[in-house]
Amino acid sequence: MKKEEYLEKVALANLWMRAYYEKDEPLASDEEYDALIRELRVFEEQNKDEVSKDSPTQKIAPTIQSEFKKIAHLKRMWSMEDVFDESELRAWAKRAKCEKNFFIEPKFDGASLNLLYENGKLVSGATRGDGEVGEDITLNVFEIENIPKNIAYKKRIEIRGEVVILKDDFEKINEKRALLNQSLFANPRNAASGSLRQLDTSITKERNLKFYPWGVGENTLNFTKHSEVMQFVRDLGFLKDDFIKLCANLDEVLKAYDELLTLREKKPMMMDGMVVRVDDLALCEELGYTVKFPKFMAAFKFPALEKTTRLIGINLQVGRSGVITPVAVLEPVNLDGVVVKSATLHNFDEIARLDVKINDFVSVIRSGDVIPKITKVFKERREGLEMEISHPKLCPTCQSELLDEGTLIKCQNIDCEDRLVNSIIHFVSKKCLNIDGLGENIVELLYKHKKITTLESIFHLKFSDFEGLEGFKEKKINNLLNAIEQARECELFRFITALGIEHIGEVAAKKLSLSFGKEWHKQSFEAYVNLEGFGEQMALSLCEFTRVNHTRIDEFYKLLNLKIEKLEVKSDSVIFGKTFVITGTLSRPRDEFKALIENLGGKVSGSVSKKTDYVLFGEEAGSKLSKAKELEVKCIDESAFNELVKE
């Protein structure tokens, strides 16, 4: 690397660092930033006389520019040296002149915080800032519930740690921001940092932040080991993670790293590595510091789960109900040992929200077995070659005209090849026509051998169609054919459900069956939208589906003997007209309780509101039960429910 290129990279690294620390809006992934810093270090080690004083390797963070007051730390807050593999870890240990007795703990991916206590009282809280001076966020710190406001130690002490947002809370925060049309946080770390730096303390409070201590600054403690210091701190009332170890040697450190890496997905908060630290405080004092790092500790980083790459195209996938899902085609990138070439974009509203274009640089995250997704678009890096992503007009598979609802774009052709197999699997499933023995694998086998080519072809299957197919003997074939014959006698609402119409589930299908009978598919938009519980989106979906498929539905009527169940409700029941929500695990399937409630004139809803009359709860009931108690909705267990319906 030449000096000119080095200085350009210094400027780029500073730009990325300011965006990260000052605005909580990163312009590059951690992996991309780390790689750039490593390039700078290589040049600087080989050209010591040409090191720029502006290089990020020579400072902790940019000078603070914010609406918060500045507050000086009593002792400097240092960054940590990163190591990425065993050889780098052993090289660090050699420089630290230490081969034994290491303190290790998770490196949580959050925002660093310095707490100052005097006379046992919390007097201030500050961000890391540039290491010497941070932002005074004391008022927000008082809103973090798990930070003790009073401790049993009366001398002056700085307690330092990481503020994190749990993964579940992060998803809830972004869901709320999406509803308010606010920009989404790219990751929990940015959310934690942004939550600490709110001018409105009530926002900090509602974010449910957690503080995990990892060290001390100014103090008059007399311990000889860091592990003793941290035990003392946690005994004051601070949170302790369950993965904290003392390792006798580097082999044990490596074993602990592998163990912690397996827990990465299970931990409720994000981790990006493991902290490895010399436990002997006298040796730590002897080792001292570089310009930027303590020599006695390092961050043993995990493989990146988030990287920057370029979006080079869009593929369209057709789902069971005909919904078109846009999938981003990416320049291949290695994420935690997996080569990622695509990422879901969910729908076209998501494309608009992200304002993503073909040829954009994007940040891609992969978590466990979850499909990779794009979390951020680096618009500042656009080069003028980007292209808009337009809504498709024709189905990519069958070329039929698509229904464009804005958020959802759908193919209405139920014989479309890409949706046919999944349509058949849904059609014969337990909640639909309930054809015993015609499971997913059998459907795929029959489709592969062209024995099933349409939904109707199920009812034209013959004994000879199964002959020669693996696993089919006379008894099995006869049982399956008998099950198909029995399925001809089914309730109308099950048939409507089986068609897989977008937005039309079992409850809506029952309403259509009871309201219109076999003429349900010949109604107007106004007739649909006036049904209780139906909205414009449901009505539009019905109109478009029946417009395309009304003759097919009439053909089905010739194949099936559809029954219209009359719902006989007891108007004198104590639960007549009452709304129930069911949550948790009960002794019988939830559908049985639902049917009983409806037969007694009640209704079952999927969400709790002020209009809910009862919440029937079982074991492991979750947020619905909590919300019901907040709204003072009557909550009953199974025993109380049984007594209620007996009345």
From Swiss-Prot:
Its cofactor is Mg(2+); Mn(2+). GO terms for biological process: DNA repair; DNA replication. Gene3D superfamilies: 5' to 3' exonuclease, C-terminal subdomain, BRCT domain, DNA ligase/mRNA capping enzyme, Helix hairpin bin, Nucleic acid-binding proteins. Zn(2+) binds at C395, C398, C411, C416. InterPro entries: BRCT_dom, BRCT_dom_sf, DisA/LigA_HHH, DNA_ligase, DNA_ligase_AS, DNA_ligase_CS, DNAligase_adenylation, DNAligase_N. One of its GO terms (molecular function) is metal ion binding. The active site is at K107 (n6-amp-lysine intermediate). Its EC number is 6.5.1.2. It holds the Pfam family DNA_ligase_aden. The keyword Ion transport does not apply. Keywords: DNA damage, DNA repair, DNA replication, Ligase, Magnesium, Manganese, Metal-binding, NAD, Zinc. It comes from the Bacteria. PROSITE patterns: BRCT, DNA_LIGASE_N1, DNA_LIGASE_N2. Belongs to the NAD-dependent DNA ligase family. LigA subfamily. DNA ligase that catalyzes the formation of phosphodiester linkages between 5'-phosphoryl and 3'-hydroxyl groups in double-stranded DNA using NAD as a coenzyme and as the energy source for the reaction. It is essential for DNA replication and repair of damaged DNA. This is DNA ligase.
